[in-house]
Each structure stands twice: as structure tokens, then as C-alpha cells.
Amino acid sequence: MRFDRLPPAFEDQAPDVCAFRDHFHGTRSLLMKPNDSAPENADTNSPSPCSRILSRRELLLTGGAAATAFTIVPRHVLGGVGFVPPSEKITLACVGFGTQAIREIGGILASPDVQVVAVCDVEKDGTHYLEWGKNQIRDGIRQLIDEPGWREGSDHVPGGRDVGKEIVETYYAKQRGQDQYKGCACYADFRELLDKEKDVTAVKVMTPDHTHAAISIAALKKGMNVIVHKPLANRVMEARSVIEMARANKIATHFLPASEGANQKQALEMIKNGAIGTLREIHNWSMRPMWPQFPNLPTDKPPIPAGFDWTLWLGPSLDRPYHPDYTHTHFRGWYEFGGGSIADMGHYSLWPIFQDLGLDSPVSVESTPSHVCTVSDTICQRIKNDFSFPAACTIRMRFAPRGERPALDLYWYDGGIKPPAPDELMAENKELEEEGMMFVGDNGKILGGFRSEDAQLIPETKMRAYRTAHNLPEPAPRER
């Protein structure tokens, strides 16, 4: 991945390393109404940004001088319980309306503090998106807008700006008891949206990784608050530029997918209580990737689908011929457009670890990737590429001592690779699960789920003794 260049959209920004505050917290996803449960096989890894969302008043106040431009008259009492007057709603523009945006739109539409007023996507009305379960997206839309026959006869995966506009307006019409609702603008180019939609309070960016920074910076320049899906950017310098812009303008932002819950705190509490002695290693492994990792660049040149703007999709990236292997979930596997498995899932599992242990940049990083072989002119040889992520890899990050914390190593594994099963687990005739996290100290080990949830000392006898010593209740059985 290249870290040495700044695309034209960022040339006037001075990158700097600076902290930022997470103003939005999320715990809910999918196309669900507030009281619905997740459908079977639904991907619940990505939290919605709407379980706790700032009011318009809070957003304006965090914007500093911008708050003085508005006179807000509270009318909650006049409107009754749950009523939020239009003057206090967050007016939201959704940039990017593919499968992940569709999964999250239910929680946004259900929030009384938010009014979706515009959608934007380079795809008009696509049917070639990818999903994690057959008809999951289509059936989720049907459930959300309460139309069981929506797009009857189509097994394609829908997405795009027209789909987004239809979802938003149908949902609002039914919530108001109306036959129709017309209040959601529709754009192909985010720049046009930002120029024309003067009343937008916040922008939610849910596009391929390589366009996150360009869209976020453009919105921040307009004084708009930004929610951007992980990762913040696809280049270190781009991420620093976004952070610096948000800090300089004192604008409320959300640059991470979620904060950890109490269940994820247990491992860190045990570490702080000395349950495993001095922490030396952290191991985190993921079943990702769930998309193809192509070892070769495509050579054929299929036509660009009708209604899909390839130039806008490329954004700040260099021009190249269109190919479906670059787009619609596939983008995660390419250096130019995505960040691989660790950028897809590492934010969820590692952010709390970095935050609570005070980890900064590692002093060194080494990666051991898998490779692909081919036969060329009767010769077996490895395929060399510098454009796509491997099917599997191990990454080792070494962190220098900081304060009272000694040096430690953090290991990331993906593509089916796991660390060796610890002796404590093998003695109980158990194996490591498909995903998980393990903390290794001088005097013991803690094993948990992918985000360190349901953390337990191993072996079980050690956990029982710890639970007794700290008056902790017996845990509920884990769902598998």
C-alpha cells in the first residue's frame, strides 16, 4: 500500500497526527425496525451509527460559531412525548447506498432525531451487488418498508441512489400515513449534493474505502458534520488530513464503527487486576476475507453497466479500464481501493485495545503473506503482485514500552490462519474457534471472542478461582 502520495483533493491540507473524539456510538445494524431481531445469517458485525445520535442542537453547538446562525425554539412539550420539531432534527445526507448502507438505513430512519433529506451514489439502480445471504438485502428492504412484494420476481441484489430514494420516501410516507412522500433528493456526484443541499446538517459516508477521505474533507469544508464508515481513509496521509480538518473546524464527527461494550471490558479488567501477570502478546484472528483476493489484474474489458458512473467511482484514483472485479465488495481486496481484512474488521476488535492500553504507532511491522502459484511455459512459479492483498496473512506489530506498560507484540491473522492452540486449551481437548482474541502474559492467558467478548482465563479452573476471588457471577452460556 502506498503512503507516499497525497491525491489532488488533499494537496492543500497539512497532514498532522492528532487525536479525535468519537461523538457517535453504535450498537445496532441491519434493515430492522426498532423492535425487530436480526434475520437468520444476517451480518451483525457492523454496528449502526444511530443507537445514540446527537441532536441537531448538540451538533450545532459543537460547531462553534456556526451555532450562532440558528435560533432553535424547543417544541418537545408542544408536540408531545417523542416529538422532535423539524428545527431540531439532524438533516442527513447519505453518500453511498450499496448493501452496507442499506443494512444500516433502518436504524437511521427509525430515529426521531434524524431526517434523511438526500442520497447519493454513482450507481443509479444496480442489480449486481454482492451480499452475505441469498436475498438478504431484498428481503430486508421488504421488511423495513412493509411491502412483502417489493421487486417480486427479482433475485438480484439491489443498490444505488434510486433504491435509496425509494426506501427513504416509502418509509417516511408510511410513517406519516400518506400515500406518498417527496422529500429526498437524489444525486450521482457527492460534490453536487454538497453544493445544492444547503440545509444538510450531517453527511454519512458509506462508499468504497478509497473515496472516504475525499468525501469527508469536502463535507467538512462545507461545515457539515461527518459520519464515515471504517476505515477513515485508505492512506495514512489522507486520514491525517481528515482528522486535522475536523479538529480545525471544531466539527462533530464519527470516524470509527463503534465503541466497545461492557462485555468487551472484561479481558482488560482481568489484565489490570494482574490475572495473567505482565501482558506480553495479543493475538487476534479473523475468518475474513469473505470476498475474492485476485492474484492478477483483469485483462478483459467488459462494458460499463448502464447507470453506473465509473469515473465517479474511481474518484481520486488513477484512471483504469472498468471491471466488475474492482467494485461491489471486491474493492476490499485491492491496495488501491481497499484495506484488506484488517481494515474491514480490525477496527472492531483492535480499537478498544489501542484505546485502553494506550497503544500508539508500532515501532515495527512485519507481514507473512500466503502466495499463489501458476504454470507458465511448463514452469511452476509464484505469481508476484503489488496490487492486491493475499488470501491469508499474519501481521506482527511490535510496540515500544510506554509508561508502566512494557513492550508487547500484537499479532493479526486472517484467511483461516490462527495462532497455535495454547497448551491450556489442548489439555482440555479443545480447539481455537474460527475467530477470537487471546492475551498472553507471564503468568497466564485470556481467551475471548473476536472482539475479546466473553473473555475467560484458561484453563477453566483458573477462571473459576478468579471469579470466586472477585465475587463475579457465573457467565451465561455463549451462543455459537
Predicted segment positions?
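Structural recognition of the beta-strand scaffold that forms the well-ordered cores
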Residues: 91-95, 116-121, 186, 204-205, ...
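Glycine-rich, aromatic-lined ligand/substrate-binding cores of catalytic
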Residues: 97, 306-480
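A structural signal for well-ordered alpha-helical segments within the folded catalytic domains
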Residues: 102, 213, 217, 240, ...
